[in-house]
Swiss-Prot record:
InterPro entries: Beta-tubulin_BS, Beta_tubulin, Tub_FtsZ_C, Tubulin, Tubulin/FtsZ-like_C, Tubulin/FtsZ_2-layer-sand-dom, Tubulin/FtsZ_GTPase_sf, Tubulin_C. PROSITE patterns: TUBULIN (PS00227), TUBULIN_B_AUTOREG (PS00228). Tubulin is the major constituent of microtubules, a cylinder consisting of laterally associated linear protofilaments composed of alpha- and beta-tubulin heterodimers. Microtubules grow by the addition of GTP-tubulin dimers to the microtubule end, where a stabilizing cap forms. Below the cap, tubulin dimers are in GDP-bound state, owing to GTPase activity of alpha-tubulin. GTP binds at residues 11, 69, 138, 142-144, 204, 226. Mg(2+) binds at residue 69. One of its GO terms (biological process) is microtubule cytoskeleton organization. This is Tubulin beta-1 chain. GO terms for cellular component: cytoplasm; microtubule. Gene3D superfamilies: Helix hairpin bin, Tubulin/FtsZ, C-terminal domain, Tubulin/FtsZ, GTPase domain. The keyword S-adenosyl-L-methionine does not apply.
């Protein structure tokens, strides 16, 4: 089986991860003690993508939980699904990273990383055919960003040919909870560009917007936000876990979505997003799902796809539906909005269909888009970084852990290069290149 090893790092990562496993257990009919209580044989057919089977028929999540302080893990352990995780797989320190990337990456995190890698190795050795790793973390704090990226680079060294998928929660544009967030995020993006294969970009502001505008919640909690993220996470991997007519896995996803190796930051969306009370008043249709899925207001990161162009996109539908109709709808979207797709990648939307809908819905769809407009997020973080770095504000916290200023200059340059690359492909047209080729041929002659 094609197993996935799940890692959650830091407070944010562990809270999202906790919610994710609740959704997984729900879909596979597994209760809070790890016993199967479902009533549908397909729930167990590929349950080992995410679960190990222990003695006595219990199912244990293939999850590694790490943090530099015990708090979040304690609350996970005492929560409703706390008993389901393998106790050895909780790896935590006592000191915390104090929102300092350097502590997570170079000092505190570096001391703990070997014990995390031992657990990762043990889980990987138990797999028949490990497909890849998925990592939940935020880029604003110290542990998820610093230690999370350290772990990614170590896993990269040891398992270079396995897929590395991250669910990364970015800094909020207005009013972050951490002053040094721009530093932490820029240092992390530098690592993700080099070592991750696919990054699903999420951010709290966009999730809050969805909660207010679409779900009509008056005061959304982090629980509501994490629920949105976890439904999307489950949609990304449903093809691996349930049979479908058009399957996809992490590698197929990467091949279809990444035209240039550094540009692997995706926007994600999910449909149907309706407020809790209004679901029973409408029936879902494929055109409706498609329309909502491509709606800019449904994107889970604060970048507007209408400000850029899609290089590629992928749509995963769940539920009983005709693949012909799905393809038809996708072609419709591309024809109607052709200016938002680059014309030099024809047919750049991949769709896949999985027969089993999520709990409580008749059909749903998950969207992933590689859009050049994601540069808005990087540009915003980079501007905040520059303003602080110019005055060397807060820098002593990082240099005190052994970093030097050169590293900061380097990560800023890398972030700006990334923005420039997105801009370059946004402006590229299909025509320019033919002229270049003619010139090349003339020179060769």
């Amino acid at each position: 089986m094609r197993e996935i090893l799940h890692v959650q790092a830091g407070q944010c990562g562990n809270q999202i991860g906790g919610k994710f496993w609740e959704v997984m257990c729900d879909e596979h009919g597994i209760d809070a003690t790890g016993n199967y209580v479902g009533n549908f044989h397909l729930q167990l057919e590929r349950v080992n993508v995410y679960y190990n089977e222990a003695s006595g028929g219990r199912y244990v999540p293939r999850a590694v939980l790490m943090d530099l302080e015990p708090g979040t893990m304690d609350s996970l352990r005492s929560g409703p699904f706390g008993k389901i995780f393998r106790p050895d797989n909780f790896v935590f320190g006592q000191n915390g990273a104090g929102n300092n990337w350097a502590k997570g990456h170079y000092t505190e995190g570096a001391e703990l990383i070997d014990s995390v890698l031992d657990v990762v190795r043990k889980e990987a050795e138990n797999c028949d055919c490990l497909q890849g790793f998925q990592i939940c973390h935020s880029l604003g704090g110290g542990t998820g960003s610093g230690m999370g990226t350290l772990l990614i680079s170590k896993i990269r060294e040891e398992y270079p040919d396995r897929m590395m998928l991250t669910f990364s929660v970015f800094a909020v544009p207005e009013g972050s909870d951490t002053v040094v967030e721009p530093y932490n995020a820029t240092l992390s993006v530098h690592q993700l560009v080099e070592n991750a294969d696919e990054c699903m970009v999420l951010d709290n502001e966009a999730l809050y917007d969805i909660c207010f505008r679409t779900l009509k919640l008056t005061n959304p909690s982090f629980g509501d936000l994490n629920h949105l993220i976890s439904t999307t996470m489950s949609g990304v991997t449903c093809c691996l876990r349930f049979p479908g007519q058009l399957n996809s896995d992490l590698r197929k996803l990467a091949v279809n979505l990444i035209p240039f190796p550094r540009l692997h930051f995706f926007m994600v969306g999910f449909a149907p997003l309706t407020s809790r009370g209004s679901q029973q008043y409408r029936s879902l249709t494929i055109p409706e799902l498609t329309q909502q899925m491509w709606d800019a207001r449904n994107m889970m990161c604060a970048a507007d796809p209408r400000h850029g162009r899609y290089l590629t996109a992928s749509a995963m539908f769940r539920g009983k539906m005709s693949t012909k109709e799905v393809d038809q709808q996708m072609i419709n979207v591309q024809n109607k909005n052709s200016s938002y797709f680059v014309e030099w990648i024809p047919n750049n939307v991949k769709s896949s269909v999985c027969d089993i809908p999520p709990t409580g819905l008749s059909m749903s769809s998950t969207f992933m888009g590689n859009s050049t407009s994601i540069q808005e997020m990087f540009r915003r973080v980079s501007e905040q970084f520059t303003v602080m770095f110019k005055r060397k504000a807060f820098l002593h916290w990082y240099t005190g852990e052994g970093m030097d200023e050169m590293e900061f200059t380097e990560v800023r340059a890398n972030m700006n290069d990334l923005v420039a690359e997105y801009q370059q492909y946004q402006d590229a047209t299909a025509v320019d290149d033919h002229e270049d080729e003619d010139e090349d041929e003339a020179m060769a002659a």
